[in-house]
Amino acid sequence: MPIQVLPPQLANQIAAGEVVERPASVVKELVENSLDAGATRIDIDIERGGAKLIRIRDNGCGIKKDELALALARHATSKIASQDDLEAIISLGFRGEALASISSVSRLTLTSRTAEQQEAWQAYAEGRDMNVTVKPAAHPVGTTLEVLDLFYNTPARRKFLRTEKTEFNHIDEIIRRIALARFDVTINLSHNGKIVRQYRAVPEGGQKERRLGAICGTAFLEQALAIEWQHGDLTLRGWVADPNHTTPALAEIQYCYVNGRMMRDRLINHAIRQACEDKLGADQQPAFVLYLEIDPHQVDVNVHPAKHEVRFHQSRLVHDFIYQGVLSVLQQQLETPLPLDDEPQPAPRSIPENRVAAGRNHFAEPAAREPVAPRYTPAPASGSRPAAPWPNAQPGYQKQQGEVYRQLLQTPAPMQKPKAPEPQEPALAANSQSFGRVLTIVHSDCALLERDGNISLLSLPVAERWLRQAQLTPGEAPVCAQPLLIPLRLKVSAEEKSALEKAQSALAELGIDFQSDAQHVTIRAVPLPLRQQNLQILIPELIGYLAKQSVFEPGNIAQWIARNLMSEHAQWSMAQAITLLADVERLCPQLVKTPPGGLLQSVDLHPAIKALKDE
């Protein structure tokens, strides 16, 4: 057989083998075209799982009459025009293959109208040479695409379609993923004349959690931890479910987007799985909805026929950025201590004696630590990056990328005003800022400590209360507020409303944000220590306390809240006690020098030693 150029229809059918896998593939390509056209409303009508009819209607910018024939031609697009555009793709579509491929395996009709045109025009391609016919039509501004009898002329492909229910489930999943990517677009999905999904557009700054709950379910919403992580041109936003409460049903929720494009990327999944591995079983999977924003020049989306995968120019950097972003939220949720700096310090104040037993940042240590220590690194403060390398970091990557990677994982020292030179004080003893070494747990809530040969008992609930008070008390800046996924709405009396309004500035310093109307108050954000509390009990009690006060000082309110917080530990473990002491020593060093009543009690061993010697 001689070499010859294939007919246009046959060439398009071959290309359709990569682009059009099943009806859901058609829906994905056409809806993405609608989004690229600036549509704010998209209606999808499906019949018989998409095998009979797929109709996509949008209110986008439309297509001019002169461009309708080009729209159905191969490699014709308005989204890129040069090599530079290909290297920084910001649109969902860019190859110009979808419509030509779909029209070659179905009866496709394209109807469109722009705002400048007085009438709409309809185009369809038919025949061996795919000649396009254009005729007038009635249509509002926007575009409608009808795909009839998918694979009617390729029986082999049609034979491999699954049942109507299965094919529609694939379409439904595609729409769910797209709806999570574009909260600003109204999307309606119907099957066989019956409306199945209605996702209303969320206004800018609105409650995205309503759509999140409609798509992912209330179980995910209740366990979701919000992520907001940024470094340079990299931004990570979204939600990850608490791994301690992940169920097999929740594990099916794994939605990831890169610059608004839905992805199934192994690098991203590995980073998330690695961040959660200490809290997940071997057969468990994390649940997440995450949005990664990156400079378009740093990612290549033209590596997969269906554009399901991307390639990052600095894959290691992106991997560890995502890993650290997810890990930081999980660590904050567990309220673990800040990382210890590995650089030399003026005095060893920040490394108490018992931190060796506690397991300081062992990612930076070559030797293995005691198994009592947590496997994870302590969580960074908001916006910070730990300075230690990751446990699986590969030493052989390039120096230039290594420098960028090092900058990602380090936090610049805050700018401070120069101070006048002061006389150098003698360095403190290594254990002068430490309660001592934890020996064991006594009666489930007391830690037996040893320091300088002396034994003492420390009340862990009291230490936890002092820590909460320190975390809640504002310093030079207000306490960071954590937005609630589901705001808490409470009915209040006129007296309580007046007290709340008077205390609003003090509460704002504590990270408590609310809005009030005639008879209700809506709590929108709380500080981190309150995130896991039963707010439906705590907040009304706080409002009752404020109603009895005449002066509203943040410190007094923080003290009241700390005393009324429920402890997360019914029984304390050694690791939990060591972690708590590390936090208290860091945030409340004055308690080490002058322990308040009820916190620390020395144990006199001399009578026991004397009795032993007298035997």
UniProtKB/Swiss-Prot annotation:
Alphabetical list of PROSITE patterns matching this protein: DNA_MISMATCH_REPAIR_1
GO molecular function, one term: mismatched DNA binding
Biased composition (Low complexity): 364-391
Family, per entry: Belongs to the DNA mismatch repair MutL/HexB family.
Keywords: DNA damage, DNA repair
CDD domains (UniProt xref): HATPase_MutL-MLH-PMS-like, MutL_Trans_MutL
Stated role: This protein is involved in the repair of mismatches in DNA. It is required for dam-dependent methyl-directed DNA mismatch repair. May act as a 'molecular matchmaker', a protein that promotes the formation of a stable complex between two or more DNA-binding proteins in an ATP-dependent manner without itself being part of a final effector complex.
Keyword Zinc: no
GO CC annotation terms, alphabetical: mismatch repair complex
Gene3D superfamilies: 3.30.230.10, Histidine kinase-like ATPase, C-terminal domain, MutL, C-terminal domain, dimerisation subdomain, MutL, C-terminal domain, regulatory subdomain
Keyword Membrane: no
NCBIfam families documented for this protein: mutl, PRK00095.1-1
UniProt cross-references to Pfam families, sorted A to Z: DNA_mis_repair (PF01119), HATPase_c_3 (PF13589), MutL_C (PF08676)
GO BP terms, alphabetized: mismatch repair
Residue segments, region Disordered: 363-397
Name assigned to this protein: DNA mismatch repair protein MutL
Organism: Escherichia coli (strain 55989 / EAEC)
